[in-house]
Amino acid sequence: MKRPKLKKASKRMTCHKRYKIQKKVREHHRKLRKEAKKRGHKKPRKDPGVPNSAPFKEALLREAELRKQRLEELKQQQKLDRQKELEKKRKLETNPDIKPSNVEPMEKEFGLCKTENKAKSGKQNSKKLYCQELKKVIEASDVVLEVLDARDPLGCRCPQVEEAIVQSGQKKLVLILNKSDLVPKENLESWLNYLKKELPTVVFRASTKPKDKGKITKRVKAKKNAAPFRSEVCFGKEGLWKLLGGFQETCSKAIRVGVIGFPNVGKSSIINSLKQEQMCNVGVSMGLTRSMQVVPLDKQITIIDSPSFIVSPLNSSSALALRSPASIEVVKPMEAASAILSQADARQVVLKYTVPGYRNSLEFFTVLAQRRGMHQKGGIPNVEGAAKLLWSEWTGASLAYYCHPPTSWTPPPYFNESIVVDMKSGFNLEELEKNNAQSIRAIKGPHLANSILFQSSGLTNGIIEEKDIHEELPKRKERKQEEREDDKDSDQETVDEEVDENSSGMFAAEETGEALSEETTAGEQSTRSFILDKIIEEDDAYDFSTDYV
């Protein structure tokens, strides 16, 4: 019975009832034990595997491994398909009218047909598709936002793309300094002063955990003095809104804003922060956005997400390791991580990772693997795993490092004074400067002593023309599959040869066996007639044909 003014009923009961419950429980357990005893203990049969004496053991094991791998890939693909279907259903349930009214006309206008994309993706090179999508975004946009990582702004700029935007006509280019909470404030201010001489620059810090539009969240009472989570806070959103809104008023028409940049600089996170909803897919892995995506911010401003730039293979090894999503697959992890480590300040790296001084990258990765408990069989340090760990930290959004801006500003060859003035026209730069100052004051960046100094390799060259892209090599999985198939074919040929040899050997053995049997029988008869010590089983009957002397 629930007592008045209390949330829960009392758990007290009479002793008779408690003992009765305990007795029932004991009887139930006794009954279960008795049934288990009757059934007996059946030891599970151990899989004996393929015996060593079995023919074609290696081929059988290889087939079993391939079958297991195919099943795992099929399960993973089914899981991804289910997730996509659930996301589609959730979007339709939450906003059933947004797709036909807003998104479909825009997709038709910008040429975003999913069936065409699927048909092209099966035939054409994926990098060529990225170039096509990037060109579509630049052509369809009135304002282009180039997102830069505040830790290395110069390394996140692509001169080829900027030159294409300048040559395309009346388009505005704005720089966004994202991840500004991962650099010291002094360094952020110096980079802002350097970049704003050339183009309008916005200090930004995207929210990595926006509200999911299809997820129903429970309201939880928050403490009065409790600060919001670091990942939920967004800085610079108001300044960017005012900048785009002011430009739209000067144009007196609806504008389209394209968001471009290298992989993992936070393009989709900026769109989600502006929309305050999970509109674009974001994640730790690089290069998740593979096609342009139209997101209406309001009636007058439409924002377009784009795939990342394609990094030219002629760049330095550190630029390839930090900017290319395929660097860890194409290049060996040790080479990519060593290139990053060579550009970082050794003393600050030692303090950050709490390792002793190192002479080379191999020694550093060995000590790091021991410190992090990354071991292989036999207690050997997993050096490759430590290299992958360092690469993931430096390309992620958690490690604090910074670069110094150049001492003197020199405009690139595709920029001149008239182009700089034209790019800044139509924007309220005074209000932008005030908003940037407020954002810098609000952002809690790391101290200089807690961040790592990095030597930037300068501008990163990209590829925007399809003719400059060479044909892609098959992916690692496809290459492995082809190698396995080739091995399987060669093994089958060798097996057939072995079978032929064995069969011919068997036939030869049969023929020789008959001859040998005749020879041996003759030999046996001769030995029987000449060996006197051997006991010979003969008939006791008297043989009249034999002359006994």
Swiss-Prot record:
GO molecular function per UniProt: GTP binding; mRNA 5'-UTR binding; RNA binding
Family assignment from sequence similarity: Belongs to the TRAFAC class YlqF/YawG GTPase family.
InterPro entries: G_CP_dom (IPR030378), Gnl3_N_dom (IPR014813), GTP-bd (IPR006073), P-loop_NTPase (IPR027417), TRAFAC_YlqF/YawG_RiboMat (IPR050755)
Polar residues composition-biased segments: 518-529
Protein name listed in UniProt: Guanine nucleotide-binding protein-like 3
Localisation per UniProt entry: Nucleus; Nucleus, Nucleolus
Region of interest (Acidic), ranges: 465-543
Region Basic, residue ranges: 2-46
Region (Disordered): 1-56, 73-104, 474-532
Natural source organism: Homo sapiens
Region (Intermediate) residue spans: 282-456
Main location (coarse class): nucleus
A GO biological-process term: positive regulation of protein localization to chromosome, telomeric region
Stretches assigned to the CP-type G domain: 131-312
Compositionally biased tracts (Basic residues): 1-45
Its job: May be required to maintain the proliferative capacity of stem cells. Stabilizes MDM2 by preventing its ubiquitination, and hence proteasomal degradation.
Coiled-coil features, chain-numbered ranges: 56-95
Swiss-Prot/TrEMBL domain comment: The basic domain (B) allows nucleolar localization in the absence of GTP. The intermediate domain (I) inhibits nucleolar localization by the B domain and is required for exit from the nucleolus. Exit from the nucleolus to the nucleoplasm requires both the I and the acidic (A) domains, and may be triggered by GTP hydrolysis. In contrast to other GTP-binding proteins, this family is characterized by a circular permutation of the GTPase motifs described by a G4-G1-G3 pattern.
Binding site for GTP: 178-181, 261-268, 305-308
Keywords attached to this entry: Acetylation, Coiled coil, GTP-binding, Isopeptide bond, Nucleotide-binding, Nucleus, Phosphoprotein, Ubl conjugation
Crosslink position(s): Glycyl lysine isopeptide (Lys-Gly) (interchain with G-Cter in SUMO2): 91, 99, 114, 179, 196, 253, 267, 275
Annotated positions of the Phosphoserine modification: 101, 490, 504, 517, 529
Modified residues (N6-acetyllysine): 79
One Pfam family in the UniProt entry: GN3L_Grn1
Domain of life: Eukaryota
Organ and tissue specificity: Increased levels in lung tissue in cancer patients.
